[in-house]
C-alpha cells in the first residue's frame, strides 16, 4: 500500500474553506477505514513547518480555491519533495485562471463561449457585450461571485463595483449559453460518465447553495443524451484535461443548447469537490467505482513533478 501515512490538507483561508473541510473530512474518513494512518491538517501560513514535522508519505490535497488549487500549495509540496494528489503547479495555476484556461482549451479545438477578460469597473460602466451574459471572478470556484445579466437588462450591472464585491478586480465576461448543464470527470487518462445537473427550482442557476445544500440539485448520471453528444462531452473533457496538463482527476462543465445543437465547454476544475453532495462521487459510482476506490486511487497516483 503506497503512502501509509497520508496528510489530508483541508480548510485553509479561501472563501471555499467550508467545502474543503467537508471534502477533506470525508476523504480522511475513507482512508482511515482502508488502513492508512491519516493526519488531518487545517492549512495555514505555517503549513511548511507542519509538514516537515509530520513527514507524511503522501499529501492528499483537499483544498479548494486560492492557495489550494492555484499552484501555491503544489509549489510548497514540490519544494518539500512530498508526493501529492491532483494536478501540479503549472496546470493548477492555469486552470484556476478561467480566461487563460479557456484560450488554451480552445486552441485544441474544444468549443467555448465567446468571452473577454476585463476590469469589473469597466463592466459596471457599460455592457461589455450584448446581454445575456455571465460575469465571473477570474480565479474563484464554487460559483462564488457569479452574476447573470439577463437579456432585457438595459443598465450594466452595478453589483460588481460595490463594496459587496470581495473578489479580485479582473473578471471574465462570457456569452450566456441557455440549455442543459452537464459535467464530466476525468480519472487519469479516462473520461468517466457524463452527469446532467438540475438545480432546485428555488435557485437561479447551479450556485453555491445548489451545489452544497442537501437537496439543492439533482444529478442524473449517466445523462440522457444522444450517443454522439455524450461522446463529444467525454472527448472534450479529456482534451481539456490534457491541454491544461492536468494529472490525477479533473471535472469539466458544459452547456448544451438543444435548439441550436451548440455544445460549449465552460471551465475545468482540478480539485473536484468530494463532499457528500458533490458531483464527482456520483460520476464515479455510475462508472462502477466506489467513493473509496477513487480516494485510494488518488493516493496511489500521488507524485512530485506533476
UniProtKB/Swiss-Prot annotation:
PROSITE patterns: ATP_GRASP, DALA_DALA_LIGASE_1, DALA_DALA_LIGASE_2. GO terms for molecular function: ATP binding; D-alanine-D-alanine ligase activity; metal ion binding. Mg(2+) 1 binds at residues 253, 267. Pathway: Cell wall biogenesis; peptidoglycan biosynthesis. It is found in: Cytoplasm. Belongs to the D-alanine--D-alanine ligase family. This is D-alanine--D-alanine ligase. It comes from Bartonella quintana (strain Toulouse) (Rochalimaea quintana). The gene is ddl.
Amino acid at each position: 500500500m503506497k503512502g501509509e501515512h497520508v496528510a489530508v490538507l483541508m480548510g485553509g483561508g479561501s472563501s471555499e474553506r467550508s467545502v474543503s473541510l467537508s471534502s477533506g473530512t470525508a476523504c480522511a474518513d475513507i482512508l482511515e477505514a482502508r488502513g492508512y494512518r491519516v493526519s488531518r491538517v487545517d492549512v495555514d501560513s505555517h503549513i511548511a513547518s507542519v509538514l516537515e514535522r509530520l513527514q507524511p508519505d503522501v499529501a492528499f490535497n483537499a483544498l479548494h480555491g486560492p492557495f489550494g488549487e492555484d499552484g501555491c500549495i503544489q509549489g510548497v509540496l514540490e519544494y518539500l519533495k512530498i508526493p501529492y494528489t491532483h494536478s501540479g503547479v503549472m496546470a493548477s495555476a492555469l486552470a484556476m485562471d478561467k480566461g487563460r484556461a479557456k484560450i488554451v482549451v480552445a486552441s485544441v479545438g474544444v468549443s467555448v463561449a465567446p468571452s473577454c477578460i476585463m476590469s469589473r469597473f469597466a463592466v459596471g460602466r457599460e455592457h461589455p457585450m450584448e446581454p445575456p451574459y455571465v460575469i465571473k471572478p477570474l480565479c474563484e470556484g464554487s460559483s462564488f461571485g457569479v452574476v447573470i445579466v439577463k437579456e432585457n437588462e438595459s443598465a450594466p450591472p452595478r453589483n460588481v463595483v460595490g463594496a459587496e464585491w470581495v473578489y479580485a478586480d479582473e473578471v471574465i465576461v462570457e456569452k450566456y449559453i441557455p440549455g442543459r448543464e452537464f459535467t464530466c470527470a476525468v480519472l487519469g487518462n479516462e473520461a468517466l460518465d457524463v452527469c446532467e445537473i438540475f438545480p432546485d427550482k428555488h435557485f437561479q442557476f447551479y450556485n453555491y447553495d445548489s451545489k452544497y445544500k442537501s437537496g439543492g440539485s439533482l444529478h442524473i448520471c449517466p445523462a440522457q443524451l444522444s450517443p454522439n453528444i455524450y461522446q463529444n462531452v467525454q472527448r472534450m473533457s479529456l482534451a481539456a484535461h490534457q491541454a491544461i496538463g492536468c494529472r490525477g482527476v479533473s471535472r469539466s462543465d458544459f452547456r448544451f443548447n438543444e435548439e441550436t445543437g451548440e455544445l460549449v465547454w465552460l471551465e475545468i476544475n482540478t480539485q473536484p469537490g468530494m463532499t457528500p453532495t458533490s458531483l464527482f462521487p456520483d460520476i464515479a459510482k455510475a462508472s462502477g467505482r466506489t467513493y473509496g476506490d477513487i480516494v485510494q486511487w488518488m493516493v496511489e497516483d500521488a507524485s512530485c513533478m506533476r
